[in-house]
C-alpha cells in the first residue's frame, strides 16, 4: 500500500469513499456467477476462521494452514474489488509487485498471492446478524473463483462474530491464538508506535487501514475493551490490561466449545506434536511441518505486578485447555 502509484491510490480511494461501487459490482457478480452454485454445500463445509488479539501469530498461522492448498482466501490481488473477485479477475492494477516485508517489520513478507483479512469489509457493509444467506453467497463466490471447497479467513474482528459464524457455517472451526502476555503486549505497544508514525507520514495508509477495519494500532486505534486502570498506550500496562480483558472474555465464552473452538498457544507451535494436534482438530492434513520462528524480546522491567500475575494465571488456564 505504501508503494502504490497515483492511479492505484485514486482507484482505492474511490472504492473506499463510494461504497456503491463495490456493492453494485457485488450484485452483478451474483447475477452472473452465482448460478450453478449450491449454497447448502458451502454452508456445511469445514471452513476455518482464525481470530484473536493481534500479535498472537494469526498471520503465521494463516500462512501455515494456507500452504496446504486446500482452502480459498481473499488475497492482496483482489483489492480493491473484494466484493466481485470473479467479475474483476481480469483487472490487474498491481503488476510487477515483488514480495515485500510488511510494514510491521516482523520478518513476514507478503505478495499479491498472500492471503489477508479482507472479508471484514464485506461484513461491515451488511447487517451481518440477519445476513447468513448473504455471507454464504459471498464465500461461495470466493470459493468458485479459487476452485476450492473450503474457506480460510484470518480476521481479528471475527471474535465478536463467532456465534454468527457458527450459525452460518455449523461445521466451521475457530482458532483463537494467544501468546505470552508480556511478549504480546510489548509487540502490540511497539506496533502502535510503528503505525502511528506510518499513519502520520502517509494518510493513504491510514485511509486504507480504516477501509479494512484495521484499528488495532496507530492513529486510528480503538481499544478492544474499555480501559479500567490504564489509558496511556505508551504504557505497557495498557496493553497487558487489554490482553487480560480480551482473553478473559473469550475464555469464558468458548472454553467449553471444544468441538468447534480451539485456543492456540503461539509458543507451542514449534512443537511438531502440537502441529499434529492442530491438524487433527481441523480435520485436515497439515503435512508441511513448518519451523515456526518464535521470537522473544527484552521487555520493560516496570509493570503492574498484580495485573501481570492475573495475565500469567489466565495464560496458564488457556494452555491447560485440552
Predicted regions and their residues:
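PAPS-dependent sulfotransferases, especially Golgi type II membrane carbohydrate sulfotransferases
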Residues: 1-41, 196-322
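Pre-Walker A (Motif I) flank of P-loop NTPase domains
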Residues: 44-47
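Hydrophobic anchor at the beta1->P-loop junction of P-loop NTPases
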Residues: 50
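P-loop (Walker A) phosphate-binding loop of NTP-binding proteins
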Residues: 53
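A conserved segment at the C-terminal end of the G1
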Residues: 59-72
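PAPS-dependent sulfation machinery
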Residues: 77-152, 216, 220-225
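Conserved phosphate-donor/acceptor-positioning beta-strand/loop module used by diverse small-molecule
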Residues: 154-156, 165-190
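A short acidic, amphipathic alpha-helical/loop segment
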Residues: 161-168, 277
Amino acid at each position: 500500500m505504501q508503494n502504490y502509484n497515483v492511479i492505484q491510490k485514486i482507484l482505492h480511494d474511490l472504492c473506499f469513499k463510494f461504497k456503491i461501487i463495490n456493492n453494485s459490482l457485488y450484485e452483478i457478480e451474483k447475477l452472473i456467477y452465482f448460478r450453478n452454485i449450491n449454497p447448502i454445500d458451502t454452508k456445511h463445509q469445514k471452513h476455518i476462521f482464525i481470530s484473536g488479539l493481534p500479535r498472537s501469530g494469526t498471520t503465521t498461522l494463516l500462512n501455515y494452514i494456507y500452504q496446504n492448498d486446500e482452502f480459498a482466501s481473499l488475497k492482496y490481488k483482489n483489492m480493491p474489488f473484494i466484493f466481485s473477485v470473479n467479475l474483476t479477475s481480469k483487472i490487474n492494477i498491481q503488476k510487477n509487485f515483488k514480495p515485500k516485508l510488511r510494514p510491521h517489520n516482523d520478518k513476514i513478507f507478503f505478495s499479491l498471492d498472500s492471503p489477508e483479512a479482507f472479508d471484514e469489509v464485506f461484513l461491515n457493509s451488511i447487517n451481518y446478524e440477519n445476513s447468513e444467506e448473504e455471507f454464504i453467497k459471498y464465500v461461495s463466490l470466493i470459493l468458485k473463483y479459487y476452485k476450492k471447497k473450503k474457506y480460510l479467513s484470518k480476521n481479528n474482528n471475527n471474535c465478536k462474530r463467532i456465534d454468527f459464524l457458527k450459525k452460518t457455517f455449523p461445521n466451521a472451526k475457530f482458532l483463537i491464538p494467544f501468546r505470552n502476555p508480556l511478549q504480546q503486549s510489548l509487540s502490540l505497544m511497539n506496533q502502535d508506535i510503528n503505525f502511528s508514525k506510518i499513519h502520520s507520514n502517509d494518510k493513504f495508509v491510514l485511509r486504507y487501514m480504516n477501509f479494512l477495519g484495521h484499528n488495532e494500532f496507530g492513529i486510528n486505534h480503538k481499544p478492544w475493551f474499555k480501559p479500567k486502570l490504564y489509558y496511556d498506550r505508551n504504557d505497557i500496562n495498557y496493553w497487558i490490561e487489554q490482553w487480560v480483558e480480551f482473553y478473559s472474555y473469550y475464555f469464558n465464552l468458548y472454553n467449553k466449545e471444544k468441538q468447534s473452538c480451539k485456543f492456540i498457544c503461539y509458543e507451542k507451535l514449534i512443537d511438531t506434536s502440537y502441529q499434529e494436534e492442530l491438524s487433527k482438530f481441523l480435520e485436515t492434513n497439515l503435512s508441511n511441518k513448518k519451523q515456526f520462528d518464535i521470537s522473544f524480546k527484552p521487555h520493560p522491567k516496570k509493570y503492574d505486578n498484580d495485573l501481570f500475575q492475573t495475565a500469567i494465571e489466565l495464560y496458564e488456564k488457556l494452555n491447560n485447555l485440552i
